[in-house]
UniProtKB/Swiss-Prot annotation:
Sample GO molecular function, one term: 4-hydroxy-tetrahydrodipicolinate reductase
Keyword NAD set for record: yes
Organism per entry: Pseudomonas putida (strain ATCC 47054 / DSM 6125 / CFBP 8728 / NCIMB 11950 / KT2440)
Residues reported to bind NAD(+): 8-13, 34, 98-100, 122-125
Catalytic activity: (S)-2,3,4,5-tetrahydrodipicolinate + NAD(+) + H2O = (2S,4S)-4-hydroxy-2,3,4,5-tetrahydrodipicolinate + NADH + H(+); (S)-2,3,4,5-tetrahydrodipicolinate + NADP(+) + H2O = (2S,4S)-4-hydroxy-2,3,4,5-tetrahydrodipicolinate + NADPH + H(+)
CDD domains for this protein: DHDPR_N
Protein name, UniProt field: 4-hydroxy-tetrahydrodipicolinate reductase
Length: 267
């Protein structure tokens, strides 16, 4: 059995991850961690996820459960994830990282840690989203510079980073396929007298409202026709199942920084 720990286990995504782990053959939740000031520390992780008691109590410190897991799943905050990354690197633990909002410099720290431990880092662990990335690469290469490209994403009102990590990853895939640098061509929102659109740019539009789990559309607009590639998530479980799938895939892997394209063999 693959021994899995979940960081941020008392949160919405954490509870969904606990459920996904317990539903997956070959995986087992052996540790659950949340922030030290959580009033739920000491509670049974299974009861937090409405599964009934499973005998795993919520801890407030990763170090206290260091001997109880093989791989840590972390969907928290960059500052928290980086601390956990240092811990896992020191103790030889694999990691699944679904945290978004990293800076370029922070992503480099993930790559450095990948020299010592196996890591799967992805902006989105949904199988559908990762298939969409493959389709986006194909579409961009075929359509080339003859289209205007816009990325529209929507998430729930509690999401703190924008654009979403998935939207940015979609932009990177499209830009790379076209030989462009996303940092140079990205346009984040428009207002006022913007002038005519530069064909080389890739636009981003962000919506934050209600309980939207995650909607992403990439628009390729040409003269006379439009191609839209859209993915809509209706449940966090799709991300959680992908993360657990990645955790099982990492078993026996050499150190390295992998992503879901590797897990799904889409390269």
């Amino acid at each position: 059995m693959r021994r899995i720990a979940v960081m941020g286990a008392a949160g919405r995504m954490g509870k969904t991850l606990i459920e996904a782990v317990q539903q997956t053959p070959g995986a087992g939740l052996t540790a659950a961690i949340d922030r030290p000031d959580s009033s739920l520390v000491g509670a049974d992780a299974g009861e937090l996820a409405a599964l009934g008691r499973i005998g795993v109590l919520l801890s407030d410190d990763l170090a206290k459960v260091a001997d109880e897991f093989d791989v840590l799943i972390d969907f928290t905050h960059p500052s928290v994830t980086l601390k956990n990354l240092a811990f896992c690197r020191k103790h030889g633990k694999a990691m699944i990282i679904g945290t978004t909002g990293f800076t370029v410099e922070e992503k480099q720290l993930l790559a450095e840690a990948g020299k010592d431990i196996p890591i799967v880092f992805a902006a989105n662990f949904s199988v559908g989203v990762n298939l969409s990335l493959k389709l986006l690469d194909m579409a961009a290469r075929v359509l080339g510079d003859d289209v205007d490209i816009e990325i529209i994403e929507a998430h729930h009102r509690h999401k703190v980073d924008a654009p979403s990590g998935t939207a940015l990853r979609m932009g990177e895939v499209v830009a790379n396929a076209l030989g462009r640098d996303l940092q140079e061509v990205a346009v984040y929102g428009r207002e006022g007298q913007t002038g005519a659109r530069d064909r080389k740019t890739i636009g981003f539009a962000t919506v934050r409202a209600g309980d939207v789990v995650g909607d992403h559309t990439v628009l390729f607009a040409a003269e006379g026709e439009r191609l839209e590639i859209t993915h809509k998530a209706s449940s966090r479980m799709t991300f959680a199942k992908g993360a657990v799938r990645a955790a099982l895939w990492l078993d026996g892997r050499e150190p390295g920084l992998y992503d879901m394209q590797d897990v799904l063999e889409l390269r």
